[in-house]
């Protein structure tokens, strides 16, 4: 199961000596030693938890779940990412050592899912916060699909060049989502917020111990004054 074709490895010479490069050797060593950081916020994470059991046995891929981002090289986001949790997710990603990879699991993580229509607190895709290597659609994806995503990621690792991976880090995207809510007649007289969010993701240094949420999202709230009597 762990066998992987290694395209960059040179053929064995007549003297039975295998010649390769340091980059190829590094990629080969990381194929069966991916240490994931499990970032589960919703029901998709239950499907990933089933991989730990004996039926699917993800240990055969060399996956060792870690609880610290400083010891992980893969973060698997499963579930809805809210704007309140976005700074924490970016901070976890920045604390991971290079090279690092991201698997976006589930429709809610990739596009916001059913919450993307008119939700004031849902991020429309985790790729607006961190770069994604493998997209895994589904609601929720099956455990077999997760294993297929891990296999595709391992193929990508076997073919990449370390210097290119470091140099091609994508910058955080900027996006704006406007929400306009109308006050229902049954709520007239109550305190209601009509919020217009201008969300700009600001690049932060990985050495920053704490990243405040106000550095990521700027809120412009218009609060109408109603008679509370």
UniProtKB/Swiss-Prot annotation:
PANTHER family per record: NADH DEHYDROGENASE, NADH DEHYDROGENASE [UBIQUINONE] IRON-SULFUR PROTEIN 7, MITOCHONDRIAL
Signal sequence residues: none
Cofactor note text: Binds 1 [4Fe-4S] cluster.
Entry protein name: NAD(P)H-quinone oxidoreductase subunit K, chloroplastic
GO CC annotations on file: chloroplast thylakoid membrane; respiratory chain complex I
Organism: Piper cenocladum
Family as reported in the entry's similarity comment: Belongs to the complex I 20 kDa subunit family.
Gene encoding the protein: ndhK
Reported cofactor(s): [4Fe-4S] cluster
Keywords: 4Fe-4S, Chloroplast, Iron, Iron-sulfur, Membrane, Metal-binding, NAD, NADP, Plastid, Plastoquinone, Quinone, Thylakoid, Translocase, Transport
């Amino acid at each position: 199961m762990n066998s992987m074709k290694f395209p960059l490895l040179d053929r064995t010479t007549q003297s039975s000596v295998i010649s390769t490069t340091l980059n190829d050797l590094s990629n080969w060593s990381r194929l069966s030693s991916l240490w994931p950081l499990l970032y589960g916020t919703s029901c998709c994470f239950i499907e990933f938890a089933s991989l730990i059991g004996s039926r699917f046995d993800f240990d055969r891929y060399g996956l060792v779940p870690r609880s610290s981002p400083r010891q992980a090289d893969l973060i698997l986001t499963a579930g809805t990412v809210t704007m309140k949790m976005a700074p924490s997710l970016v901070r976890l990603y920045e604390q991971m050592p290079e090279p690092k990879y991201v698997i976006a699991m589930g429709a809610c993580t990739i596009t916001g899912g059913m919450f993307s229509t008119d939700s004031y607190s849902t991020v429309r895709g985790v790729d607006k916060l961190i770069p994604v290597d493998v997209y895994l659609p589904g609601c929720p994806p099956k455990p077999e699909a997760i294993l297929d995503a891990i296999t595709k990621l391992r193929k990508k690792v076997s073919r990449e060049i370390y210097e290119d991976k470091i140099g091609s880090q994508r910058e955080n995207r900027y996006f704006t989502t406007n929400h306009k809510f109308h006050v229902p007649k049954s709520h007239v007289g109550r305190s209601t917020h009509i919020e217009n969010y201008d969300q700009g993701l600001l690049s932060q240094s990985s050495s920053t111990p704490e990243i405040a949420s106000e550095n990521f999202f700027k809120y412009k709230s218009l609060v109408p004054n109603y008679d509370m009597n």
